[in-house]
């Protein structure tokens, strides 16, 4: 971070170079499990480090960016265009909206993870909010599994990456507390 202006929601930071997105690496057939593990560990640590923390909730409790950039353009649009599944989509929205558990990136996908040396740099936090981080887990798993349809020759390896990502996330996240919180809703 070079500078920030909190009042006007502005900041400047150094460019990340040289780096290529994990998505680009995946599409090129570079199916490195270390990237999946790192992505999962980072997400799990974010969840654990912000779990039901009132300071994070106060700072990131506004879910309007997530609603404007994810819930409305994707999920409510799906519900409007596909009436046969509309109720299930609206039920899911009603389930996830009130949950305030931990920091949630809102776009935890390989396109927002830059591979740099042995690590990843995570970018694009415009949807971040204090909500239900299971969204991030599902979002990334969805990306990894769907690439198996796009690249059937790598489907098994991509599904293995998804399992590696999930295991690393759950190992770092407060999974038992999470299960109790989800069951209580």
Go through the PLM ranges and name each one.
Residues 1-54:
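ATP-binding pocket architecture of kinase catalytic cores
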Residues 19-20, 129, 148:
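Feature marks short, surface-exposed loop/turn motifs that line or immediately flank catalytic pockets
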Residues 31-38, 81-84, 157-161:
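Soluble or luminal CAZymes and related metallo-dependent hydrolases
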Residues 38-45, 103, 139, 164, ...:
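Alpha-helical elements of Rossmann-like donor-binding domains used by nucleotide-donor carbohydrate transfer enzymes
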Residues 45-95:
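Active-site catalytic-loop/activation-segment of kinase and kinase-like phosphoryl-transfer enzymes
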Residues 90-135:
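Active-site acidic catalytic loop and adjacent metal/ATP-binding pocket
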Residues 135-174:
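Active-site activation/catalytic loop segments of kinase-like enzymes and analogous catalytic loops
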Residues 174-185:
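All-alpha amphipathic helical-bundle segments outside canonical DNA-binding/catalytic cores
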